């Protein structure tokens, strides 16, 4: 099953989806080194996605994940140690989100080659 998204609704994806794959790979190595976002465990990915859905709001994210606020902070700090990015800080969150979109784009391109 494929999802069709109108071009006007892609947002920043319109820029990402025009990047050449070698440039995407270079960006990913700069941001993550060898630890790509698709190598994170399910709990970490769920935490990251929910945190972004809640606009970087720690309290709301912990409530929706049914975890204590300190547990969420611990997970975010663990992510920071492994990636060097503190997604509670807007600039790092933006870099991380773009990197996740680049990973999705690269996977899509691999499947369609």
Predicted segments — roles?
Residues 1-113:
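Cytosolic nucleotide-utilizing catalytic cores of signal-transduction proteins
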């Amino acid at each position: 099953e494929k999802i069709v998204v109108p071009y006007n609704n892609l947002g920043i994806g319109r820029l990402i989806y025009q990047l050449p794959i070698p440039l995407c790979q270079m960006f990913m190595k700069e941001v993550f080194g060898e630890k790509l976002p698709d190598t994170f465990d399910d709990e970490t990915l769920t935490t990251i996605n929910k945190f972004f859905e809640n606009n970087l709001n720690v309290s709301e994210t912990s409530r929706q994940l049914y975890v204590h606020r300190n547990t969420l902070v611990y997970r975010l700090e663990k992510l920071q140690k492994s990636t060097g990015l503190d997604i509670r800080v807007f600039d790092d969150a933006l870099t991380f989100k773009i990197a996740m979109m680049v990973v999705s784009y690269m996977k899509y391109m691999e499947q369609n080659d």
